[in-house]
Structure formats: structure tokens, C-alpha cells
């Protein structure tokens, strides 16, 4: 199963010390570079940064379709745009994204998006 995640599902679980649940449920999770950068930004907080740095099951992957990212950027932020584009590229089984506009953009592209 191929899973791609946006920033919020990872950071929210990391903040409450439950990031390992993602690994238990999904195994490996792909994240685009923009999401990785957001997770390691000092604004994310030390708890999130430390959890992400030790989560060896998170795989960072570059998005190739920059045109799709640019198109999505008219609707969502860069992390969401890259996560959606990566999910399209790798034909992900599921995209974990909790922002409503991001879920709608993903659904419009035929992706199975989940998160609330």
C-alpha cells in the first residue's frame, strides 16, 4: 500500500507522542520535500522535529510534476500542493490530508483522501 501524507497528520500525532501509530497502521509513508521542510521548521516545535527526525519509516520524495504543483498552489499551500502532486505521481492508495480545500483538490484529481 502506498501512502502519502501532508504535514498536519504527522505533526498533530507527533505533538501528542503518537506518531508511531502511523507506522503501525501504514508501515512506510511518503512525504514530499515541502512537507519535510515544514515538519523540520522551528515553528513546528522541538517535539515534532525530534519525532520526525527519528521516524526512519518516513520517506522523502521529490515531486517531478512542478506544473501540477503550480496549478494546485492557486488553491492550497505548497506542502499540500506537493503532497497531492506526489500522490498523483506515485498512484497512492491514500493521501492523508486534513485541510478541507486540500481534500477537495485531491478528490477532484481522483485521489482517495482522508483526514478531518
Go through the PLM ranges and name each one.
Residues 1-94, 100, 104-111:
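Active-site-proximal, substrate-binding regions of enzyme catalytic domains
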Residues 113-116:
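Flexible glycine-rich active-site/ligand-binding loops centered on an Asp-His dyad
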